[in-house]
Amino acid sequence: MRLLLLAGLFLSVTALAQTPTPTPTPTPEEQYFEQPPEKPHLEFLWDALARYDSIYHLRVRPDIERGRFEVRPELDFVVSDRFKVGVRAVGDLGTDQNVNNGPNFDNYRSRGATVERYFVEGRPGQFVIDAGAFGMPLLASEMLWDHDIQTPGAAVSWEIPAGASTVTVTGAGFYGPQRQGDQTRIGAGQVVWRHGDPDRFQTEIAGSYWHFEPDDLKNTYFRQNYFTVDSQGQRHFISDFHEADLLLRLRFPIGHVPVLLSFDALKNYGTRGIAKDDADAFEGNVTIGRVGNPWDWRFFYTFQYVERDALMGAYNTDDWWFHTWYKGSRVGIALTVLPRLFVQGSVMFQKRLDLPTTLNRVMIDLVKMF
């Protein structure tokens, strides 16, 4: 063995002697160079939705069959990777009228166009600072917040490395997110812990507190929540809305297929009077697959149980029919037909907690993604 080692050493030395001296390999410090700063530029993005929507078994109303067409163009001025300014418009054309949106519990207007998003975003260091009207900066399920509703106000997030994990702390204040002159004030805080790689196994836990102060909210947005009516015909909530939310998400692949499991539990600590025992809500979701590239597919199943005053029904998803006071399931499957363009079909089964009848909603969507 010793002779073999000596022979190998001798051959190595001989080879080195016959080989021109190579250029020394730079150390990691010498290899490093800073990428040139990003030049200011404009970015144009847009998405669109074409939807067939059918709701039936409504008991006291005729069945509804309608179409919805929406486009959202966005223009961002990107100053650098740490600062940008943006504006986004939304245009809708539906087969129903705007007067139908209230009775149909919609968060959108069937016909019209408006500027819905205008924001300034800065990213100094580990912080993200948003001001204006922007997308929801906190992690929230559709049971709690409809992500098509923009959030006028300000938000600050701080990402803190913690070994193999990260902790993100967010504080935000919003003013009047709903349409028709809403002046509701909302304060929210959240802590998110993330660990792992979603391509292997990732855990995400988010705890948040939401404080709502309703003001000048139109009667149509009281929906299924408990309320009283004053002598002028204006509605007033019976409960306050001080909501604590705990969201758990698990991401992992099965083969090459991504899987998301999500569980959301919420409790309103502001219920009172006849609403005292109607304070809890839960959502469970499984999503398998993805969309975006041709022939990508995605399957999802969602279960929701929401008591009457567990949350404010003015701001959560309108893809279901009732906004609170129900339990139900929604299942759907999507297929990408062109880059960033997919078709999705879904069916929803929903029952109000005080009624035996289950209503159904079928939606077929053609979606162009940002």
Language model region names:
Residues 18-129, 158-164, 196, 328-338, ...:
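Beta-barrel outer-membrane channel/assembly domains of diderm bacteria
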